[in-house]
Amino acid sequence: MTGNDIVVLGRLADPYGIQGWLWLYPFGDDPLAWAEMPVWWIAREGEPWRECRLKSLKAHGNGVVVLLDGVADRTAAESMKGVLVGAPREALPTTEKNEFYWTDLIGLDVINTADERIGKVVGLIETGANSVLRVMGDDKVERLLPFVSAVVLAVEKEAGQIRVEWGSDW
């Protein structure tokens, strides 16, 4: 399975307890539904994806914790911190209108209402309140644009661009 076939769904975070559990930092809005996928794909950024069996997933407090096959204790869990979690696109539901997987936004050009190119989406950040587009300009300056309707006017995937209300000098 290549990186292009995998949609990144989240990232493993800190260990939870001493029996191999990890906090899951999801990039989506329904991580409990991931329990339906017995096989996850995991990788560190820039490394090849590999299969990993999910042993358990549960809500805990305001978050989600997971137990993966082969992660038996806290030491093993500590070594998994930062690992990306993904799934093959065909295993995921299709998105509704104005819903997007983050991976579909990465690489799109960002154009403002004055038809000025702000840059290219290189990643996203989840802040809790909303997602934030990481946009790298041609000047190698990274700009952070909130992914909210007041800023993002249209996502035109077929045209390869996102239209925004944002000044080129902001």
From Swiss-Prot:
Under the heading NCBIfam families, the entry gives: 16S_RimM
Subunit details for this protein?
Answer: Binds ribosomal protein uS19.
Q: What is known of its domains?
A: The PRC barrel domain binds ribosomal protein uS19.
One annotated GO biological process: ribosomal small subunit biogenesis
What does UniProt give as GO cellular component? cytoplasm; ribosome
GO MF terms here are:
ribosome binding
Question: Could you read off the lineage of the organism from its UniProt record?
Answer: Bacteria, Pseudomonadati, Pseudomonadota, Betaproteobacteria, Rhodocyclales
UniProt entry keywords in alphabetical sequence = Chaperone, Cytoplasm, Ribosome biogenesis, rRNA processing
Q: Where in the cell is it found?
A: Cytoplasm
Q: What is the name of this protein?
A: Ribosome maturation factor RimM
The gene from which this protein is expressed is rimM
Residue ranges of coiled coil: none
Q: Family per UniProt?
A: Belongs to the RimM family.
| Domain spans labelled PRC barrel | 97-170
Which organism was this protein described from? Dechloromonas aromatica (strain RCB)
The protein's role, per its UniProt record: An accessory protein needed during the final step in the assembly of 30S ribosomal subunit, possibly for assembly of the head region. Essential for efficient processing of 16S rRNA. May be needed both before and after RbfA during the maturation of 16S rRNA. It has affinity for free ribosomal 30S subunits but not for 70S ribosomes.
